A protein has these predicted regions:
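A short, charge-rich alpha-helical start-of-domain segment used by transcription regulators
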Residues: 14-37, 62, 129, 139
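Sigma70-family region 2
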Residues: 18-19, 45, 56-73, 92-93
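Helix-turn-helix DNA-binding module
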Residues: 125-140, 144-165
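Residues within the DNA-recognition helix of helix-turn-helix
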Residues: 32, 169-176
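Structural recognition of an alpha-helix C-terminal capping motif at a helix-to-coil junction
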Residues: 52-59, 72-84
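Arg/Lys-rich amphipathic alpha helix in sigma70-family domain 2
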Residues: 63-70, 80-100, 120, 172, ...
Length: 192
């Protein structure tokens, strides 16, 4: 029931945006910007690009609110716009490659040693690298399912594919990640 109320509330916000209500746009931004930023950051592996793309998503929402047809949840529509914007950004970046600056390390937790911080940073880098090794299609499906907890039916709506195709992409992504980490583990053990 709560899900249904959130959906109708999102639709009413979108209707307000269609009428030019900037407060409605602000409310939708506050509601979805954090999740969309996490999503775009996972897909792009570059925080600055992710922030730009997330802003672009909301500009598109404001200028294209009239194109929302109501067949999918507003959240699915937003994630679809974000996925398309990330694909466009990755295509553009492949033509003119840029090297993202490494993220500023998180401040150490009380009592945390340098070894623990380095290990955490290495693990994050390994996960990002592994996600980057997936195809765009696999990465999008996996990130929507595992990091954002969307059900397969909603992922299918976001990506414009069948539920079966979603399951296949996620299965193949997980298998590719398992193989990559197993390969890395073997290489790591051989080096020690």
């Amino acid at each position: 029931m709560r899900q249904q109320n959130a959906g109708s509330d999102d639709r009413s916000l979108l209707e307000r945006i269609r009428r030019g209500d900037t407060e409605g746009a602000g409310e939708l931004f506050e509601r979805y910007a954090p999740a969309l930023l996490r999503f775009t950051d996972r897909l792009l592996s570059d925080r600055a690009s992710a922030e730009e793309v997330t802003q672009e998503v909301f500009v598109k929402v404001i200028t294209r609110a009239h194109q929302y047809d109501g067949r999918a949840e507003v959240s699915s529509w937003l994630f679809a716009i974000a996925a398309n914007a990330c694909r466009d950004r990755r295509r553009r970046d492949r033509r003119a490659p840029i090297v993202p600056l490494e993220a500023v390390p998180e401040p150490p937790q009380k009592g945390e040693g340098i070894e623990a911080r380095l290990l955490t940073r290495e693990r994050r880098a390994a996960v990002r690298e592994a996600l980057d090794s997936l195809s765009d299609e696999q990465r999008e499906a996996l990130v929507l399912a595992r990091y954002h907890g969307l059900p397969y039916s909603e992922i299918a709506a976001v990506l414009g594919i069948s539920v079966g195709a979603v399951k296949t992409r996620i299965f193949r992504a997980v298998e590719a990640l398992k193989a990559r980490f197993h390969e890395g583990e073997t290489t790591w053990n051989a080096a020690n």
